[in-house]
Amino acid sequence: MAVPARRTSKMRKRNRRGHIKLATPNLAPCPNCGELRVSHRVCPSCGYYNGKQVVKVNN
């Protein structure tokens, strides 16, 4: 079985892992209530999506 010839340095390892990260969620204000919500999802505070109430929310 093959063995690495040289030890991978901290810098090389960190440069390689620089692209492995979480993306920030795309938040947009809800046109119905104004709360921030994730784009293309039902608003968790009012239950509206695309101008229609989709989910009944208990306040």
Swiss-Prot record:
Residues in coiled coil: none
GO biological process: translation
Keywords in alphabetical order: Ribonucleoprotein, Ribosomal protein
GO molecular function, one term: structural constituent of ribosome
Taxonomic superkingdom: Bacteria
InterPro entries per record: Ribosomal_bL32, Ribosomal_bL32_bact, Ribosomal_zn-bd
Pfam families assigned: Ribosomal_L32p
Family designation: Belongs to the bacterial ribosomal protein bL32 family.
NCBIfam families documented for this protein: rpmF_bact
Protein known as: Large ribosomal subunit protein bL32
